[in-house]
UniProtKB/Swiss-Prot annotation:
Residues 121-315 form the ATP-grasp domain. Belongs to the D-alanine--D-alanine ligase family. InterPro entries: ATP-grasp (IPR011761), ATP_grasp_subdomain_1 (IPR013815), D-Ala_lig_Van_CS (IPR000291), D_ala_D_ala (IPR005905), Dala_Dala_lig_C (IPR011095), Dala_Dala_lig_N (IPR011127), PreATP-grasp_dom_sf (IPR016185). Disulfide bonds: none annotated. It comes from Rickettsia bellii (strain OSU 85-389). This is D-alanine--D-alanine ligase. Pathway: Cell wall biogenesis; peptidoglycan biosynthesis.
């Protein structure tokens, strides 16, 4: 399905990509989550960019022995290229804080908050960020009918890349009584907002710009659409009135800064049809770096090529005391 494959690395290994350079970077990716493939595709591009920029690079496939591997190679910096559980949820940053190894992307609090859709929603609302109405449903509630009026969105608590997200439309042959809760015993049920899908790239606290996603095949911006060529068109910059565009960037910066994010992030919004009201969907503290990813595309439009983007992210590396 995907044009970009991950034959360059075998599972659970340390692989020296470059043994000479100004600093030694451990590129941590792969791992055990449902987003393993995306992580490896991101890491391939990041690894090449780091080598081109003159760094010594060692790839580490995330596993239970990650601390042993890091102790063995003694990197100057960890480039956290993980997506999903253990990397994006704050686990790896927590370990690196203990080991006193500087790392890219957000720390424990921002990562864990952004990854948990329930807690991030509470954070957004506390900071007056507009979101769609939602409720939490547990498997034990034994709901037999639609929990809210259709159309609505089903979201797992802690998955990225739209894994497990389903949109239930009026005409769908769907019975909630048969929903099997594949990604945990609780889900968020969110009112579906019909509108324009907008994405904002943020780097070091400043919004670089925004683009709009135009769906070409699927009904919503799901995993397949995100990572398969020809399923979506990116309009960069997003064709919006200036006042709405500026508000979109300011809201994104507000989310990033109040959550104390670091490095690169991507904020997602819906601009509701008819009302032009912005609804925040989420902030991703570990945005993809694949050839189809949004942050590199927006950065490139604004004059930051991929190698420079990776170097800018690397400059933010630190650990938390």
């Amino acid at each position: 399905m995907h044009k970009y494959q991950t034959h360059w690395v075998e599972s659970s290994e340390i692989k020296i990509l470059s043994d000479k350079g100004k600093k030694h970077i451990a590129l941590v990716a792969g791992g055990m989550s449902a987003e393993r493939e995306v992580s490896l595709i991101s890491a391939e591009g990041v690894g090449k960019a780091l080598i081109e920029a003159g760094y010594k690079v060692t790839f580490i496939d995330m596993g239970a022995d990650i601390a042993v591997k890091l102790h063995e190679i003694k990197p100057d910096i960890v480039f956290n290229c993980l997506h999903g559980t253990y990397g994006e949820d704050g686990c790896l940053p927590g370990l690196l804080n203990i080991m006193r190894i500087p790392y890219t992307h957000s720390g424990v609090l921002a990562s864990s908050l952004a990854f948990d859709k329930v807690h991030s929603r509470s954070w957004f609302l506390t900071n007056n960020i507009n979101m769609a109405e939602s409720i939490v449903i547990s498997k034990g509630d034994n709901i037999k009918t639609d929990p809210i009026k259709r159309p609505y969105v089903i979201k797992p608590f802690t998955q990225g890349s739209s894994i497990g997200v389903e949109v239930i439309f009026e005409e769908d042959d769907f019975n909630f009584a048969n929903y099997d809760f594949p990604y945990g015993d609780e889900v968020i049920i969110e009112k579906y907002i019909k509108g324009r899908e907008l994405q904002v790239a943020i780097l070091n606290g400043k919004a670089l710009g925004a683009l709009e996603i135009k769906l070409l095949k699927n009904r919503f911006y799901d995993y397949e659409t995100k990572y398969t060529e020809g399923f979506a068109e990116h309009l960069c910059p997003a064709p919006l009135p200036t006042d709405i565009y500026d508000k979109l960037l300011k809201e994104s910066e507000k989310i990033y800064n109040t959550m104390n994010c670091k490095g690169a992030a991507r904020a997602e919004f819906i601009l509701e049809d008819g009302t032009n009201k912005l609804y925040a969907l989420e902030i991703n503290t570990h945005p993809g770096m694949t050839p189809l990813s949004i942050v590199p595309e927006i950065a490139a439009y604004h004059g930051i090529d991929f190698v420079n983007l990776i170097e800018e992210i690397l400059k933010t590396a630190s650990f938390e005391s």
